[in-house]
Amino acid sequence: MNSILGLIDTVTNTIGKAQQIELDKAALGQQRELALQRMNLDRQALNNQVEQFNKLLEQRVQGPIQSVRLARAAGFRVDPYSYTNQNFYDDQLNAIRLSYRNLFKN
């Protein structure tokens, strides 16, 4: 009688463990999906931040350049080699963009 009860107990434990393994597998699958969704959302958020950063940077750069153009159009003499030079700002903008892109590469 004890051997039959022991056998039933062993089978019950084995089935319970098998069910727990299946539940763990399902939970891991769901966690993986959630992790992938979270990674995609993080990537989208980073892309949005990069776009906002680029827009802000272009506004800051284009402001002084536009001021120089307006000053020249108004007849003022503007030093072409000053820090407001177009090439200087383009170089700075490209350098910052490249470093920012490299920071968030996949």
Swiss-Prot record:
Coiled coil ranges: none
Cellular compartments per GO CC: host cell cytoplasm; viral capsid, decoration
Free-text function comment from the UniProt entry: Minor structural protein that forms a portal-like structure at a unique three-fold axis of symmetry, following binding to the host receptor. The virion attaches to feline junctional adhesion molecule A (F11R). Once attached, the virion is endocytosed. Acidification of the endosome induces conformational change of capsid protein thereby injecting virus genomic RNA into host cytoplasm. The channel formed by VP2 may allow the delivery of the viral genome through the host endosomal membrane.
UniProt KW keywords: Capsid decoration protein, Capsid protein, Host cytoplasm, Virion
Subcellular location(s) of the protein: Virion; Host cytoplasm
Source superkingdom: Viruses
Domain observations: The N-terminus domain points away from the virion surface.
Main location: virion
Entry protein name: Minor capsid protein VP2
Species of the source: Feline calicivirus (strain CFI/68 FIV)
Family: Belongs to the vesivirus VP2 protein family.
Further facts: Translated by a ribosomal termination-reinitiation process from the bicistronic mRNA coding for VP1 and VP2.
The protein's assembly and partners: Homooligomer. The portal-like structure consists in 12 copies of VP2. Interacts with capsid protein VP1.
